[in-house]
Amino acid sequence: MRIPRIYHPEPLTSHSHIALCEDAANHIGRVLRMGPGQALQLFDGSNQVFDAEITSASKKSVEVKVLEGQIDDRESPLHIHLGQVMSRGEKMEFTIQKSIELGVSLITPLFSERCGVKLDSERLNKKLQQWQKIAIAACEQCGRNRVPEIRPAMDLEAWCAEQDEGLKLNLHPRASNSINTLPLPVERVRLLIGPEGGLSADEIAMTARYQFTDILLGPRVLRTETTALTAITALQVRFGDLG
């Protein structure tokens, strides 16, 4: 069996003993049914990975001995801040999971005129917690040792107005530029992905006022979740660490 990778939310140190957090303990003790003497890999978001060994396990708690740690940097040289207008149901979860596997550094859920998601503050907070857990699970699976933050949801214009020294991109079906025509080098990108119905004309004009560049991904119309992953992949191939 592949050695499980587990995220620990507190800083780790070599040659220490810790108790895993509740979610991790449930996964190791109840789902995988692992026991004393079995090996784990732990990471705490600091770009380090630690070998570890289970010392005790029950259905409710798992304690481990942390062994040696080492730096294991798998982050892309391209910092991508994804601004994703929220989509319904599992589409947003899928976008978050796959974007993190592809190396996105930061994700901000957005509200726009045509956003199909209407949540009160309590439900939205629960969604944010759920999305952050999805981000952690994606890092555990793909080998990243830093966990990207899922920021609190924002209004589209407030996000566009934030100061950012990087390249600002907006996907537009009638744009004249493509990712391949963007000048090199690029180290930071703020990538805007609109809702299923697209941005309104006023919103597109607003992004231009904040110096966003419209880009075209190709001749076909893509769903919002496909658009995000296609754009991230193309950016990583041209400016990052794919290909």
UniProtKB/Swiss-Prot annotation:
It catalyses: uridine(1498) in 16S rRNA + S-adenosyl-L-methionine = N(3)-methyluridine(1498) in 16S rRNA + S-adenosyl-L-homocysteine + H(+). One of its GO terms (cellular component) is cytoplasm. Homodimer. Optimum pH is 7-9. One of its GO terms (molecular function) is rRNA (uridine-N3-)-methyltransferase activity. Belongs to the RNA methyltransferase RsmE family. This is Ribosomal RNA small subunit methyltransferase E. Specifically methylates the N3 position of the uracil ring of uridine 1498 (m3U1498) in 16S rRNA. Acts on the fully assembled 30S ribosomal subunit. It is found in: Cytoplasm. Pfam families: Methyltrans_RNA, PUA_4. InterPro entries: Alpha/beta_knot_MTases, PUA-like_sf, RsmE, RsmE_MTase_dom, RsmE_PUA-like, tRNA_m1G_MTases_N. It comes from the Bacteria. GO terms for biological process: rRNA base methylation. Its EC number is 2.1.1.193. Its main location: cytoplasm. It comes from Escherichia coli (strain K12).
